[in-house]
Every structure is written in structure tokens, then in C-alpha cells.
Design a protein with these regions (language model features):
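N-terminal low-complexity, intrinsically disordered patches enriched in charged
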Residues: 9, 56, 192-195
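Tryptophan-anchored aromatic micro-motifs
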Residues: 13-27, 67-78
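Predominantly extracellular/secreted and cell-surface proteins with exposed
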Residues: 32-153, 157-159
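A cross-kingdom C-terminal cell-surface attachment/processing module
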Residues: 184-204
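Cytoplasmic C-terminal tails of single-pass
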Residues: 206-208
Length: 208
């Protein structure tokens, strides 16, 4: 039983997001600076994040960033990834139901698109808030401080100027978590549990 309990706590869980195709698109009018690019209505937001253990049930607007081990989401133009040194987390807040499934989110990710990360450096922003996915490419950052998630060097205010583009979908779904992945320690514990069960069965046979 002890091995089983340890194994359960070692599960990593992946949560996926997908929006509908963008229904509102506003593209740049004059590319004066930065990586200008156009969104289209055939694009959408999609991706996932992984936590070290399944999210708890009945969370209410809880900051879960400390539990996130990796993330990767794309808005059709920009990919936001925990493996990218230019990606930043502004907010990673979710709510869950009694089964631990995400019912609402306030996830805001950023990608620095120019240096030196001071106004008016260019930044892309992806917002997954409630049932809406909003994407912003090549915006002008107007403030660079520490985010509410505790991440330094994050753009905390930005404007969409003539070089920027934006897109939005009012359909956003978060899928039921994939089957948890057993980590290294989970495999060790599982093997230990199987050895204990085998020993107990052998012991019973010897006694009988």
C-alpha cells in the first residue's frame, strides 16, 4: 500500500488546450519595426502543459505555476515554450471541478521578440482566459517588471501599434488529462510494490 501511494504521487499529468479557428483578426497596417506577421481565420491556438502531479480538485482561481514542469502552446504564428529562453509566464491560474479537470483558466504567456527587453521592445502575448483565446504578435512593450506569477523580466503592459497584429477565438476547450505518466521514482516504487506482493504470495504458500 505504501508503494502504491508513493507511485500515485509521482504521476505527471498533461493538460491540453485547443481553440476554434480565429473569428476576429486585426493585422498590422504598416510594418515599421519587429517581426510583423498576419493571422488568418484558418489559424487557432493549441498546445499543452504538464504538471508534476495531477491538479487538485475544486481549485478556485489558483496559481499553479509552481507545479508546471513544462508547457508548449502555439497561436499559429508564435510558439510559447518553457524550453525557450525568450518565453515568459505572466499568469498561470486555473480553476478545477470535483474531478480535477480544468473548468476555467487565466493563463497568459509571452515571447520576447526583440532586445534589450526594455520599452519599446517587441513582445508576443497569448491569453487563455475563460472561454476565449487571444493572440497578439509584435506588440510594443511599455513596462518590464516581475509578473504576477513571479517571473522576472516580463512585459507587464503593452500596446498593439500599427506594426502589431491580433486574433481571437471565443471557443476554448481544455481536454481531460491524458493517462498520467509514471516518472522514474514511480517506476521504482511500482517495481518495489510488485516485489512485495510476490514475496507475500510466496510466504503464504510456504506457510500453507
Amino acid at each position: 500500500m505504501l508503494f502504491a501511494l508513493i507511485q500515485a504521487s509521482a504521476w505527471a499529468t498533461t493538460y491540453t488546450f485547443a481553440s476554434g479557428n480565429y473569428t476576429t483578426v486585426t493585422n498590422f497596417t504598416a510594418c515599421a519595426t519587429g517581426p510583423c506577421a498576419n493571422y488568418t481565420t484558418s489559424m487557432q491556438t493549441s498546445g499543452s502543459f504538464t504538471t508534476a502531479a495531477p491538479l487538485a480538485a475544486n481549485l478556485a482561481n489558483q496559481n499553479i505555476f509552481a507545479q508546471v514542469t513544462s508547457f508548449s502552446l502555439s497561436d499559429g504564428i508564435v510558439t510559447y515554450s518553457s524550453a525557450d529562453p525568450n518565453s515568459r509566464v505572466y499568469s498561470f491560474v486555473v480553476s478545477t471541478n470535483a474531478a480535477g479537470q480544468i473548468t476555467s483558466s487565466q493563463i497568459v504567456l509571452e515571447e520576447w521578440q526583440s532586445t534589450p527587453h526594455t520599452p519599446p521592445s517587441r513582445v508576443a502575448i497569448l491569453e487563455l482566459i475563460a472561454s476565449t483565446a487571444s493572440a497578439f504578435n509584435n506588440t510594443a512593450c511599455t513596462a518590464d517588471t516581475t509578473s504576477p506569477a513571479g517571473v522576472a523580466d516580463t512585459c507587464t503592459a503593452a500596446i498593439v501599434d500599427a506594426s502589431g497584429s491580433s486574433a481571437q477565438s471565443t471557443v476554448l476547450t481544455s481536454n481531460i488529462p491524458n493517462v498520467p505518466t509514471v516518472g522514474e521514482w514511480g517506476l521504482v516504487c511500482l517495481a518495489g510494490c510488485m516485489l512485495v506482493l510476490a514475496w507475500m504470495r510466496l510466504r503464504r504458500r510456504q506457510i500453507s
